Amino acid sequence: TIRLWPQHLKGEGHYLAVLEKEGTLRQGYCRNGEEKGIPAKDLKVPGKGIVEFLDFAKDTFDPQTLAGLEKNGTYLKFGDQLYLAPKGMPSVKGLKVLRPGLHLGTVKKNRMESSHALALALKKEQVRYTADLASDGEVIRGYLNGGTFSYEGEKGWYLIMADGFSSGWGKLAGGIMKNHYPKGLRKM
């Protein structure tokens, strides 16, 4: 501990103490703030939300990307929101945390709705399907405004890119790329 007297420095004076809690930090799978202590790499029986994410990831990501996520992080679930916390992150139990890691998505009706943050964190080689559009073209402008566009390819989730940079998600079905760009970010 140390005392910083007001007559010896500018300010009102301060008292500093370093507290150290004995014991080990536990990584954990968190559900509604309750720590379960299951690192992502050791997750044998995934909980609700993680199953949906893994199904989405198997169809969308390159296999090495999925293995890298599970190796380097811990799944955290708060309500219907799923996050990937960095490896070694201490428990957030009892804390109000805005984002405890990379937001992977939201579980809705037994399916995973992937987050925009995840799309922006990915690179072209980390996903199975991409739609790389010219940044000065009408198609990307329409996408950023919330519109759909025609696209040829296999049915599934696509990482929409503008000149090689991730922009968001799209879902191809029947030759039409459905827009999954966040409504709050769309241009008018």
Language-model-detected regions and their locations in the chain:
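A C-terminal cap/extension of S-adenosyl-L-methionine-dependent methyltransferases
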Residues: 1-11, 20-24
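Polybasic, low-complexity RNA-engagement segments
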Residues: 14, 22-188
